[in-house]
């Protein structure tokens, strides 16, 4: 079962990082179009915060 937990841990870690990276790319694209540059920053912050919160809330349960 430890192998399954390690797989879940790895998947969560990389999916959280991918989510943050994707939001950053979208934010850069929107800023380069000069369309209300505060919106992508807000969206990116919310996505990054939710990803970090999900990761931190999941992590203690596995240790």
Curated annotation (Swiss-Prot):
**Which superkingdom, per the lineage?**
Viruses
Q: What is this protein called?
A: Transmembrane protein 033R
Native species of this protein?
Answer: Frog virus 3 (isolate Goorha) (FV-3)
């Amino acid at each position: 079962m430890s192998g399954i937990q390690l797989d879940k841990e790895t998947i969560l870690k990389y999916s959280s990082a991918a989510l943050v990276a994707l939001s950053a790319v979208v934010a850069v694209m929107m800023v380069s179009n000069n369309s209300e540059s505060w919106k992508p920053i807000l969206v990116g912050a919310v996505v990054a915060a939710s990803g970090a919160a999900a990761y931190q809330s999941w992590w203690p349960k596995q240790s």
